[in-house]
Amino acid sequence: MKLARVLLDGRAYEARVEGEELVTTWGQRIPMEAAVLLPPTEPSKVICVGFNYRDHAQELQVEIPQEPLFFLKPPSALVAHGQPVVYPPHTRQLDYEGELAVVIGRRCRDVRPEEAREVILGYSIFNDVTARDVQKVEKQWVRAKAFDGSAPYGPWVETELDPSDVRITTRVNGEVRQDSRTRFMIFDVFTLVAEASRYMTLEPGDVIATGTPPGVGPVRPGDVVEITVEGIGTLSNPVTGEQPADTRRGR
């Protein structure tokens, strides 16, 4: 089942996807092309994982991690399917990173990998938008990865998916930039859920973005980024705003 959130008359409502329609909990049917989708859950936190594909770590010339490298994005970074990613003024290289997202279904702490499936609601799609030039010079990734608009998430949550070997494809203006499968992850989905739950309580709706495969690269205003995950669908976001000719550093 695909679970979504939709904006109707200025309010958010839950819905399920049936073919090319959204069906609300009271039975109203909304054509997909007319729907205004919201991020499919309201996470208390977004947990991201760095360098979880060996060949991605190699393309960025970093060491292969021996344990998951976690970092956080705030809920204010979220962007819904179809909504714009506004080019931030503090970077000159804004990169896409297509990822599979795990969505937590119930409150949990200290989950074992073999129990992780029981606390997962389902899976979605995530774009870990990154100010790459900032990331390269700063040890903390707040300005590089936690700014407003850095977390496109959606379009819905698929509750019936085997995440062990699904295809992830990222296109920019229709051109394939990333094409890989989740079987190439260093740490699988259930290990990531278990490890994250060792350090923080996971709440319903929380998101764990599981890392990006190789092929990351920059986007410019006017580009459209489409990330497709087999069995889920496609997350699409245009890039708007202006790419700065200069940035101020040292603040």
Residue locations for each model-derived region?
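Catalytic-pocket segment enriched in acidic/His residues
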Residues: 39, 56, 64, 87, ...
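N-terminal accessory regions of nucleic-acid-interacting proteins
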Residues: 109-123
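Short, structured patches in soluble enzyme cores that scaffold and shape functional sites
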Residues: 73, 98-100, 104-106, 124-129, ...
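Residue-level recognition of short, solvent-exposed, well-ordered loop/turn junctions
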Residues: 48, 80, 95-97, 203, ...
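Short acidic (Asp/Glu) patches
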Residues: 30-35, 64-65, 79-91
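N-terminal non-catalytic cap/leader segment that marks the start of a structured domain
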Residues: 1-68, 161-163, 169-171, 175, ...
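Structural signature of FAD isoalloxazine-binding scaffolds in flavoprotein oxidoreductases
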Residues: 64-81, 96, 226-230
